[in-house]
Amino acid sequence: VFILLAMSALAGRALQLQAIKAPAYAASAAKKIQQAYDLYPDRGQITDRNGTVLAASEPAVLVFADPLMISRNGVDERVSMGPLETQKAAAAPKAIAKVLARYLGGTPEDYREMVTSRKPDGTLARYSLVRKHVPSYTYDLIRKALAAGKWYGINATHDPVRTYPSGTLASNVIGFVNQDGVGAGGLEYSLNKQLSGTKGRESYEASTYGRIPLGRDTLVPAVNGTDYTLTLDASMQLTVQNALASAVANTRAASGEAIVMNVKTGEILAMASMPTFDSSKAGSATGNEMINHAVQDAYEPGSVQKVLTMAALADKGLVTADSHLVVPPSISSGGGTIKDAFSHGTLNLTTRGVIAYSSNIGTTLLTRKMDKATLARYLRSFGLGLTTGIGLPGEATGSVPGASMADFTRDQISFGQGLSVTAVQEAAAVAAIVNGGVYHSPTIIRSARNGDGEQVKVPGSASRRVISAKASAQVRDMMEAVVTLEPDRAVKGYRTIGKTGTAQRIDPSCHCYRGYTASFVGVGPAENPSILTYVVLNNPVKGHEGSGVALPVAQQIMSVALPRYGVEPSTTKAPRAVLEYQP
């Protein structure tokens, strides 16, 4: 009877295990042996227009530990360990921690918790992060050292690291990624979602001995990020950065920015900011070094703004290059007085002469012919007071007075004070005025391909006519007189046009004018404008006039840019510029 009762009890327990609790035990077992980890995509590559790599992903791995495997040093839990295996397993955490410290840095104690970590329920974990972005060659050394000691439980998965082969080249445009590989500045930030791609996931059945052959596996592949080709030309960018860096150093300016643009398309060929930084060492950069001054800084442009003023006046038929104007020594404005930077008596100037001599008085008198609402509309049509849509983070809008501006404000903005712009806004506006009158929104992205290699649509340049071709020709005539005024302003072999700018700067600490912004915009060739260069130096200490400190920099850049982009030397001489007239 006793034997029958015992057999009955065992049969009941077997029934409970097999029929009633079997699903729960199976699920628990599956959970214990299922291993899963993320698959990291390659971040999209960024290159210049000619294929020079500016940002890329290099092979690296994410190193992780399997504490359960380490606790048995790879011996399958279904196998009983002998004395030697038990002794080896007991030594594994310490030995593996020493190997990790040797190749990853730190002390063995830094890794002990990683190789022995437990889940909330107290059981040993199957996954413990050790280090991200470990160079592949470093992991190879770790793997070989572990194999030599017959230690198990350290694994790795693809985890590419971001590199910037060109260092500081275009770093204020490209930006950088943070320690987690997330874009934190420049295009790396604004295009982070597209560049990042999509993580994948792999799961498989594993024992403490490792992956179970023919076990249940699932794989969702990672999708690599989108590759971007920029409009930038790395060679031109280097020329511009070197020229700008020298100018900022020589003048002891607080900062500087320079742009080279194709006036017929709006493509940015170079965009430099100084001081700058190395994208691969962003952690040691200062705030001033990381700012893209060409996009993020708004400033009063000074006399370069006269190009925009004359374009509006010429388009309305209020002036031509040969219009006559009597320019007195000074004029009253808003309870104050407007004077020119040079002392003079009464002058009889053409409009061409007003621009060549950069007369604030002459510009103000001519601007008073136009009503304020019309002037405000033209400035808006030229893109001032609005972001350009270039796609770079932190773009400033600047500030432009509206139709209700005071008379004194109208007078000021005519010659570039009382409003603020960014360098990219001003460059795009001047490009529109000299190219025949069509505004092309500036672009920095040329093309893109997704992780599958398929072409992806990118925002193109939006175009609109802002002045007539006739008005454009009149303004080019005026701007050529600026260059021919002095023999050392020309670019050897080319007829070019340009405009100097010297503006007082507002000091926020006192809300008063203190210091200067010196600038020059140059375009070539005069006969068929193609390439624009705009240089701005903020608060230079040694010299402050645009003609003295910014013009030579633009001249140096243009002497390289014009032949580089296939612009043939000029075969004609500039026409005689009539600047003054006899009454």
Task: Annotate each predicted stretch with a short phrase.
Residues V1-A24:
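Hydrophobic alpha-helical transmembrane signal-anchor segments
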Residues K94, K98, R102, K132, ...:
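Solvent-exposed, polar/charged alpha-helical surfaces in well-ordered, non-transmembrane soluble domains
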Residues Q34-P59:
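Short extracytoplasmic
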